[in-house]
From Swiss-Prot:
Encoding gene per record: mon1
Region annotation Disordered: where it falls in the sequence: 1-93, 126-145
Low complexity biased stretches: 68-79, 126-137
Record protein name field: Vacuolar fusion protein mon1
Subcellular location: Endosome, Multivesicular body membrane; Prevacuolar compartment membrane; Vacuole membrane
Main location: membrane
One Gene Ontology cellular component annotation held by this UniProt entry: multivesicular body membrane
Assigned keywords, A-Z: Autophagy, Endosome, Membrane, Protein transport, Transport, Vacuole
């Protein structure tokens, strides 16, 4: 038998077999006279690959009945997105792809073009909203999700072959494409001071080792090279590192470019330039550029809340080498507590939204009416806040408080011990950059002692139990007017029993996932209403009591519409629509269909309880 007959045809896609080095031509037929014409024709047919099925223009993740778990396996390097984005979601879903080395490459696009996620697991539709006016809001409903539909949520994500998944001795699934997470790491030492430098400098090496052992650093520097604030250590101790960072930044600026981020090993550096200031974040906590940039923006807003933008600009225009430490004296604690909240995992920063205390709509309306009834002429904003959760707000028509401004206020009020001590009254000048970065407002703060009958002193009251009345006025001399309004408001709240309602809501705590969905596989969830810029979440108990565990579940990396991944400690599911964002965490062995069904039920529960969970409109004057 001729050995050439065993060779396979090499036909390129779309080749008609008529040119080049084709086998089965007349020349080859002459060499093999034993083959008939029909055999030759059959061989040519075998040489052609079968036609591919038509490629769809779009691929819906949620189309019923379409299941192709490995359809997104292949991706060319040309499909990688090179353009950065700060959007919460992007039109084209970014899917996790694996390269030849088994490492993650993301974001990439699937082979079928744009992937479109519907607004719900079962075609979420928006129903009629509330009454027109300032109370208007987006309403939505999520019908029941059947098992088959829940399956389809994950149908186009990578699925490991059953033989690729191994189980360790603890029963956890081992997925080689996911790195071991750091949820068991000890975070207690992260917030401990590194110590003071001795007069003779003998302990400098020890302090530098402690400084380098921290997982996260924040630096605020002037363009002239002066250190203004550092989260760990001081400018003198780490002056060498500061000099290196400034040199790198200056190198790019000299080339008419602006450096925004770079990596060195597993450490990420993000730089935000604000006029004469450089704000630098250094992180080994697997955070994205966007996350770190938002954190630096919040620290900058904290500086503006103390100085205002015109004052900051004037200081550096008169003297570019100004040392900003003295004007910011007293704000170091606020900067540090704000920075630590980012490291611990702040849901408010993570979602750029506020959390509200869950109470009945009628009870919240009673508090709103009390605020309106006792309002004085110089009032700009009035808030009742319980443990950092908003209970009620009164505001001018067509004016809303920026979530970033409220985050600064809550950080100042609930973290600064001087304000909270004794449960007394405070009158504080403050700039709200989101409202007006050019001037000061004046904030009256009074803490209510709800624990007087339980024998707990005001100084022992935890942040979660603290209730504050915050009244903001543009009038510098408005203290006594605000004090009078506070007294009248407390009298009204006691008369309509709102004080006890707030106390009961605080004592009740956040609901657990099993309170909401009995028998659910979920351990924790975060739900953000994008229309109201507010969020709600389940209790941390009992799975997420430590700082490291909480930080791990509040670490968002990808900008996608539907995302499911599994690590050695947890299974997570993210679902982003124009109406809401939902982030869920379950055990690593959780069934993905059960996870999707539980997520849908959480959405239904939130929408049933919407007016209890969120402040829609608030009190308006």
């Amino acid at each position: 038998m001729n050995p050439n007959a065993l060779e396979q045809p090499q036909v390129a896609p779309g080749d008609d077999g008529a040119g080049g080095n084709n086998y089965g031509t007349q020349e080859n037929s002459a060499k093999e006279p034993s083959k008939t014409g029909s055999d030759d024709s059959s061989a040519r047919l075998e040489e052609r690959p079968p036609p591919l099925p038509p490629r769809p223009n779009t691929l819906s993740l949620l189309d019923e009945g379409f299941i192709s778990p490995r359809s997104t396996r292949q991706s060319s390097s040309s499909s990688l997105q090179a353009k950065a984005t700060t959007a919460v979601s992007i039109p084209d879903i970014s899917l996790l792809q694996l390269n030849d080395g088994g490492k993650e490459n993301h974001p990439t696009r699937g082979p079928f073009g744009s992937l479109r996620a519907k607004a719900s697991l079962t075609q979420l539709t928006a129903s009629k909203g509330s009454d027109a006016g300032d109370s208007a809001s987006i309403r939505s409903t999520a019908p029941n999700t059947e098992l088959g539909e829940a399956e389809n949520v994950f149908s186009d994500f990578l699925a490991q072959e059953s033989g690729d998944v191994q189980q360790d001795s603890s029963g956890l699934l081992q997925f080689p494409e996911f790195r071991t997470d750091d949820v068991e790491d000890d975070f207690t030492s992260e917030f401990e001071p590194i110590g003071e430098l001795d007069d003779d400098g003998r302990n400098e090496e020890l302090l530098l080792e402690r400084w380098k052992s921290k997982r996260k650093h924040y630096l605020i520097l002037s363009a002239a090279g002066k250190p203004i604030w550092t989260r760990h250590g001081d400018g003198g101790l780490i002056s060498g590192y500061i000099g290196v960072i400034l040199t790198i930044i200056s190198f790019y600026e000299d080339a008419n470019d602006r450096l925004t981020s770079f990596c060195a090993g597993d450490t990420k550096f993000v730089i935000v330039t604000k006029g004469p200031l450089y704000l630098v974040a250094i992180s080994r906590l697997l955070e994205s550029d966007t996350q770190l940039k938002l954190q630096l923006e919040a620290l900058y807003m904290q500086i503006l809340s103390t100085l205002t933008l015109p004052s900051l600009t004037h200081l550096f225009s008169v003297r570019p080498s100004t040392d900003l430490k003295r004007p910011l004296q007293g704000s170091e604690t606020l900067l540090s507590t704000l920075a630590d909240s980012f490291t611990k995992g702040s849901p408010s920063t993570f979602l750029s939204a506020l959390e509200c205390l869950k109470i009945r709509k009628s009870h919240r309306q009673a508090i709103n009416n009390a605020l309106l009834k006792t309002k004085v002429s110089s009032l700009l904003y009035g808030l009742v806040v319980a443990g950092g959760r908003l209970v009620s707000v009164v505001r001018p028509k067509k004016h809303s408080l920026h979530p970033g401004d409220l985050q600064l206020l809550f950080n100042m009020i609930f973290e600064a011990e001087g304000i909270k001590a004794g449960g007394g009254e405070s009158w504080i000048p403050v700039c709200l950059p989101g409202f007006n970065s050019s001037g000061y407002l004046y904030m009256y703060v009074s803490f209510l002692d709800l624990r007087e009958n339980s024998g707990t002193s005001a100084s022992e009251t935890t942040t979660e139990q603290s209730v504050a009345i915050i009244l903001i006025s543009p009038n510098k001399e408005g203290f006594f007017e605000m004090q009078e309004m506070r007294n009248s408001l407390v009298e009204q709240l006691e008369k309509n029993n709102s004080i006890n309602i707030i106390k009961e809501a605080i004592d009740g705590g956040r609901p657990t996932t099993t309170d909401i969905v009995p028998g659910t596989v979920l351990h924790h969830f975060l739900y953000k209403s994008r229309a109201n810029v507010q969020f709600t979440m389940s209790s941390y108990e009992p799975e997420f009591t430590s700082i490291s565990r909480r930080r791990s579940i509040h670490a968002k990396h990808a900008h996608v519409k539907v995302h499911h991944c599994i690590s050695q400690s947890a299974s997570s599911f993210a679902w982003v629509t124009p109406i809401f964002e939902l982030y869920c965490v379950a055990s690593p062995n959780a069934n993905r269909n059960a996870l999707a069904q539980s997520a849908s039920k959480v959405v239904q529960w939130v929408q049933r309880e919407e007016e209890r969970l969120f402040i829609i409109g608030g009190a308006v004057f």
